[in-house]
Every structure is written in structure tokens, then in C-alpha cells.
Amino acid sequence: MIRIGQGFDVHRFAGKGEGFRLGGVAVPYHKRLEAHSDGDVLLHAITDGLLGACGMGDIGRHFPDDDPRWRDADSIGLLASTLRLAAEAGWVPVNVDGTVIAQAPKLAPYIGAMRQATADAMELSPGAVNVKATTSERLGFTGRGEGIAAMAVVLVESAPGRG
């Protein structure tokens, strides 16, 4: 059996900083992202999509932003925890397609590293992970440079021998 899930996340820029994490990669920028965890919107969207595909709710249910355990949490760790939950329920990821929406900074130089970091974290081949970046043509909060959004689609299948 196969299932598909979609995920979404957004974080606002908050003051000066040295950059942020995106897809498990450090992206230099003159602003930082406001977040309870490390604020990696792409990995949060992927985690949310994985939970959805497995019928396990959403990222906020598993890692609530008012829980001090998740303060400054590494999003790769959150994804790893979610992958364990999925495996325990009999699901394995097959592929991921993520889109980051940001007016700035330009993300093209980091896409390859994001694909590789995500593939490594999910134990997938890089060919099973796609990451795209786009702008919103200066419309909305991302277009005004107030934050970054990401969405992801995750395909899972029943683990061998489970269905």
C-alpha cells in the first residue's frame, strides 16, 4: 500500500542574525528566523508531510512549540524521531518533493546540499528527494521579505512484510 502526505511550515524573520538552517544546511543571511526549534521550515514541512502520510497527525501534535523539550531542537533530530515512529507503524518513505517560498536570499546555491542532507537524514537516494525554491513575485509576507514558507509532499509505502 502507498500513501501520500503533504506538509507546510512558515517562520518569520526576526532581527539581525547570521542566517538560518534550511533542509539541514546553514544558509548565510543578515536575518535569522524566529522559531522555538532551529526553524528549518523545509524539514518541518517534510516531517509534517511524513506524519500526514502515515496518518499520525501533524508536527505540532508531536513536537509542540510550547514544550521546552523542543527548544532549539535540531530539525534533523525531529525528522529522525518521526521516521522511527513511521517505521514502528510499518511505513517507509519512498520519495519527497519540497518547495521553499522566499523572496530572499537566493537559495539555488544550496539546493544540492539540501537534497543531500535530506536524503541522508531519510536514508533515501538523492534522486528520491527533490527540493525547489521559488519566490511569490513580491506578493504576501514572503514577497515582502517577512519570512519563509515551505511545503512538501511525502510518499510512503508499507514496510516489506507489513502489508
Curated annotation (Swiss-Prot):
Cofactor remark from the record: Binds 1 divalent metal cation per subunit.
Supply the enzyme class, top level: lyase
What pathway, per the record? Isoprenoid biosynthesis; isopentenyl diphosphate biosynthesis via DXP pathway; isopentenyl diphosphate from 1-deoxy-D-xylulose 5-phosphate: step 4/6
Which residues does the record give as a divalent metal cation binding sites? D9, H11, H44
Query: Which Pfam families does the protein's record reference?
Result: YgbB
Tell me which cofactor or cofactors this protein depends on: a divalent metal cation
Any idea which UniProt keywords this protein has?
A: Isoprene biosynthesis, Lyase, Metal-binding
Site (Transition state stabilizer) at H36, T135
The answer to whether the entry has keyword Metal-binding is yes
Q: Which domain of life does the protein's organism represent?
A: Bacteria
What GO MF annotations does this protein's record show? 2-C-methyl-D-erythritol 2,4-cyclodiphosphate synthase activity; metal ion binding
Q: What is its EC number?
A: 4.6.1.12
Signal sequence segment? none
- InterPro entries cross-referenced by the UniProt entry: MECDP_synthase, MECDP_synthase_CS, MECDP_synthase_sf
User: What are the binding positions for 4-CDP-2-C-methyl-D-erythritol 2-phosphate in this chain?
Assistant: 9-11, 36-37, 58-60, 63-67, 134-137, 141, 144
Record field: catalytic activity: 4-CDP-2-C-methyl-D-erythritol 2-phosphate = 2-C-methyl-D-erythritol 2,4-cyclic diphosphate + CMP
User: What's an example GO BP annotation here?
Assistant: terpenoid biosynthetic process
Q: How does it assemble?
A: Homotrimer.
Q: Family per UniProt?
A: Belongs to the IspF family.
UniProt function note: Involved in the biosynthesis of isopentenyl diphosphate (IPP) and dimethylallyl diphosphate (DMAPP), two major building blocks of isoprenoid compounds. Catalyzes the conversion of 4-diphosphocytidyl-2-C-methyl-D-erythritol 2-phosphate (CDP-ME2P) to 2-C-methyl-D-erythritol 2,4-cyclodiphosphate (ME-CPP) with a corresponding release of cytidine 5-monophosphate (CMP).
Q: Which PANTHER family match?
A: 2-C-METHYL-D-ERYTHRITOL 2,4-CYCLODIPHOSPHATE SYNTHASE, CHLOROPLASTIC
Which NCBIfam families does this UniProt record tie to the protein? ispF
> What's this protein's name?
2-C-methyl-D-erythritol 2,4-cyclodiphosphate synthase
> Which gene specifies this protein's sequence?
ispF
